[in-house]
Amino acid sequence: MVKHQPLQVYERQLCLSCLTGIYGCRWKRYQRSHDDSSKWECSWFFILCCSFLLLLVWSYFWLEAHNDYNEFNWLLYNRSAIWKDGTVPILAATLTGFTYTAFLMILALCHIVLGQQLNLYWIHKIVVLAILLTTITGVVFIDDFWQDEWDIVIISLQFTGPFLHIGALAVVTALGWVIAGQVVRVERSSDLLLVLYLVPLFISSPCIMDRSKLGPRPAVIGRRGAPMLAPEHTIMSFSKALQQKVTALEADVTISLDGVPFLMRDRTLRRTTNVDKLFPARQDHDASFFNWTEIRSLSAGLWFLRDDPYWTVQYMSEKDRNRTANQTVCSLAELLRLAARTNRSVIFSLRQPPHQHPHHQLWVSDALKAIQRSSILPEQVMWTPDWYRKKVRAAVPLLQQTSDEKLPVAELKERGISTLTLHYSQARAQDIRQFSGSNVSINVYPVNEPWLYSLMWCSGVQSVSSDAPHILKKVPNPVWIMSADEYGLIWITSDLISVAIVIGIFIFQKCDTQWKMSGMRSYNPEQIMLSAVVHRPSRDVNLMKEKLIFSEINNGVGSTDELSGYTGNGLDTYSRDDIMTPARHATKL
């Protein structure tokens, strides 16, 4: 009696099952297909790619915007009157969405490599579409609410551009294996690689320079003291900044109802004091409508322990926490005395009181009186307000005149301005060189990250204002600096390695395809085993089955036209006529 073995003998493919199961919920082998993906599924793959790329840019934006997280939270506070760290939910949602789409992208690329049909599961489609729409909404919101922050992307590319180019080159080179299997897209992929190879021609960075031309390390100015280590605008904050070896102290000055200049950034006292406890009916009033006695009675440190704006309270000692709780609002006179005692400079901006304020017209003279009554030298004070500048120069001629307005050099000289205080988005390398050549110093704010500090250093700025002097203190040299020749060598080397790998991939793919085709042409379909007398491994059975299918397609032979037994080990073979059914056997008899 002849035993027959079924044609469909499968080997376990756990990895492939997981791949198609997670991506398209196709866990069974009969659900998979090697056919070309439909236009509908290709459209969803395009949507997935768009979601991934948009999230990649969105993630990069928030990664570089870390320098200005506190500014973002402060803008949210001004709009909602409630202090909260709005970056936490944004970062959590961005990380989740990016991880999800990146995982699906990897699965989709694996489908393409293995020749599997793309068939994204409907739940994945809903989630991907929701991620895309949410990201677009976030981009529109930031463009409306924080539009100026987009500049950080352009500026950061001057620092990260060379490394992003190498990373993109490595990714595209690694995807060469996928691209090589798609013959139709070879020409397009070659164009993409050519563009990537030539990208360094358009990369410009201040850090690509000769080390001999690097200027001195920029001085660090404590912006509102050291607000990451202690409550802003308090004596404790300025003392912490002095411990970090800052060269100057920066503050925002407001005039009280009785004409005392004090330090306050906000229009009201709600955020940085306990005014809601002592004066609940007046908590939304302008800070300048409180007299100095009332202001002095407020705590300027409890809010820092409660809100923990920089996530640093957990690292404070018990002594520092007690000291923080006892901080009060600081006056300009106190700041000037501290600076005089430690031989530091002071730079401040002055806010004019409202029209109903009794010192609305006297605000400049009130600030000048505080300077003249203190023991600080006039040349240690950097005067920023443009109001009544001529009168100020006439009253105290030794004050250092500074401006936060980017003006032509001739006009700066006419006004007697020797220092420009600019936002980092306005500090271009060519402008910095021009001002420095005219003996106008450049101070850039806010600079809280080492990469931005390094970029400003290579650009040639003289000083930076920072909320994080304790971080910049740990940057003795630029994070990276290289000459044009060194960068050119890295560029050419990486391009040559990429070209060699891509050519090797295409050659291997071509040879592998030719080998498979030659193997199918030389294989005899009659070698397929029907008899189970000799049990062959399932892997061999599958291989022979696949070769039979391909050979039948090429030779036009149907599976019902010819079947043979297995000839191995001296066993006889049987044709279709030799295998008789019971009916045929009875007829013959």
Where are these predicted regions, by residue range?
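Phosphate-group recognition and catalysis centered on beta-loop-alpha active-site segments
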Residues: 1-589
